[in-house]
């Protein structure tokens, strides 16, 4: 008997991940994510620890589902970013003031109970306290402006300016949190070649 085909969330929701190098409006359906929240400089140890915790839970849940006959590909890393206080536009704040929520998309059939069970099993193995902070969340973004950014993360401001102009041209404004979808691994790709989908809800 041939092996069952793995579910590929990016292929299943391809329209939501199309991002040319010009800003465009997209409609994003509600989606389930494994999520963990943190703050501070993304080059600091806390960020890496939470990325590791998120992937540990993601692969544990995936293997559990594979044994049950519901195999799927673990999706890539995504993140929500925002500032705090009176200046919520994070580009105006120091990196130590940034707030972020790291995300990995999961199929709709994944439940909070199995995420909790995966985290518990990892904690029993002594895999790190950050594991306990991984939760299942549903993100409801709806209408968004989306665009592909190529280059260093620190140069995203120019891409965001183009996205903001797109929103204004359609009589819309930014709302909610800045969303990044990482298509490149910064450990293996030069900064000028990094590819990141930028998304921002509008209304």
Predicted feature locations:
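A solvent-exposed interaction/effector surface
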Residues: 1-203
């Amino acid at each position: 008997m041939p092996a069952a085909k793995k579910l590929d969330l990016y292929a299943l929701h391809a329209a939501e991940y199309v991002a040319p190098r010009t800003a465009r409006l997209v409609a994003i359906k509600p989606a389930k994510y494994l999520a963990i929240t943190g703050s501070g400089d993304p080059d600091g140890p806390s960020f890496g620890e939470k990325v590791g915790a998120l992937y540990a839970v993601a692969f544990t849940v995936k293997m559990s589902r594979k044994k049950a006959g519901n195999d799927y590909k673990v999706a890539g890393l995504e993140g929500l970013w925002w500032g705090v206080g009176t200046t919520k536009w994070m580009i105006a704040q120091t990196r130590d003031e940034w707030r972020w929520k790291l995300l990995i998309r999961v199929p709709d059939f994944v439940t909070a109970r199995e995420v909790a069970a995966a985290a518990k099993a990892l904690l029993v193995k002594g895999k790190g306290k950050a594991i306990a902070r991984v939760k299942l969340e549903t993100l409801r973004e709806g209408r968004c402006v989306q665009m592909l950014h190529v280059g260093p993360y620190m140069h995203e401001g120019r891409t965001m300016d183009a996205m903001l102009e797109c929103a204004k041209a359609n009589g819309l404004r930014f709302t909610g949190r800045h969303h990044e979808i990482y298509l490149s691994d910064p450990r293996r790709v030069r900064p000028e070649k990094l590819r990141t989908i930028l998304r921002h809800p509008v209304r």
